[in-house]
A protein has these predicted regions:
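Generic domain-boundary/flexible-linker signal
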Residues: 56, 72, 108-110
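Disordered, acidic Ser/Thr/Pro-rich linker "stalks" and the adjacent N-terminal cap
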Residues: 1, 6-38, 48-55, 79, ...
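Extracellular carbohydrate recognition and processing domains
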Residues: 71-90
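Short, surface-exposed beta-strand/strand-loop-strand elements in extracellular ectodomains
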Residues: 54-67
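Short coil/turn motifs at secondary-structure junctions
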Residues: 50-52, 66, 104
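Hydrophobic/aromatic beta-strand segments within beta-rich folds
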Residues: 19, 31-48, 61, 84-114
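Residue-level detector of conserved, well-ordered beta-strand and adjacent loop positions
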Residues: 25, 62, 74-75, 100
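Structural alpha-beta junctions
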Residues: 67-68, 118
Length: 118
């Protein structure tokens, strides 16, 4: 079964600690959700993924404007790990950003997004 995590969850705060050796790890279909500042306009995010076996993996970036409905704004494949990669998409206003994993044992080591709620 898939599991979702909020940026308020215990080890999820590590995604913003400037340390690529700490990470949140999930399996295919699992996701991590970040709350954005009120009325945030967003057109991209930088993410450092982590994976022990180094195999490429698919992922999705989804946005929500509230109400629990998420829309996929970016689908891609990660081939490089443990470094920040930039992902751009059409700009929109959103309240939450979600990263959905496409494989088992994939980690999110860091996320850089100025619009993250403090």
């Amino acid at each position: 079964s898939t599991q979702g995590y909020s940026s308020a969850a215990s080890d999820v705060y590590k995604r913003q600690d400037n340390n690529l050796t700490t990470f949140w790890e999930g399996n295919k279909g699992d996701y991590i959700t970040f709350t954005l500042q009120n009325g945030a306009k967003i057109d991209g995010v930088s993410i450092a993924f982590s994976r022990e076996n180094g195999l490429e993996t698919d992922f999705e970036i989804q946005l929500s404007s509230g109400g629990g409905q998420f829309l996929t704004v970016y689908s891609g494949t990660v081939k490089e790990y443990n470094k920040l990669l930039d992902f751009r998409f059409k700009g929109t206003t959103a309240s939450d950003l979600r990263i959905v994993l496409g494989s088992d044992r994939v980690g999110v080591a860091e996320i850089k997004l100025p619009q993250l709620q403090k």
